Amino acid sequence: MSTNKVKKVKMATKSCPECDQQIPVACKSCPCGYVFISRKLLNAKLNERSGVMDKLEDKRRRTERIRKEKINLTSTSDMENRRRSRTNSHSDPIRRGRGRPKTVGLKKQEEEKEKQEREVDIYANLSDEKAFVFSVALAEINRKILGQRLIL
């Protein structure tokens, strides 16, 4: 009752054109002497021949988009009327704007100007004695910083 079952392994094979023998695909030559030409060799030979063609293809873009011709359904007089009507609509101030409003930038500039004016006003009311005290304090701070060699 013990029967040995032999599993057949199916391989990818190719047939030799000279002797019609089945040979594994990985083999480059047949035992009869026939040599199979690899695709790499074929491509190399084709590339040598098509050297001139490659130069022509290099000038062209590889990915060219197919452009469809637009059909002009409107006549030129209609287009002129549309252009005129659009120019009139631009003068209307009731346009709904998208995105950030333009006044935001102006407000920031006004705030910066006000800050500068405030700073100028603060120092303008400073007495001569206070200005002298502050200048001495700043000189002392600068001397200490330079003594530490923090600023190179």
Swiss-Prot record:
Keyword Coiled coil: yes
Bias type Basic and acidic residues, positions: 49-71, 107-118
InterPro entries: C16orf87-like, UPF0547
Chain coiled-coil ranges: 42-75, 102-130
Region (Disordered): 49-118
Keywords from the named record: Coiled coil
Family in the record: Belongs to the UPF0547 family.
Protein name, entry field: UPF0547 protein C16orf87 homolog
Organism: Danio rerio
Phylogenetic classification of the source organism: Eukaryota, Metazoa, Chordata, Craniata, Vertebrata
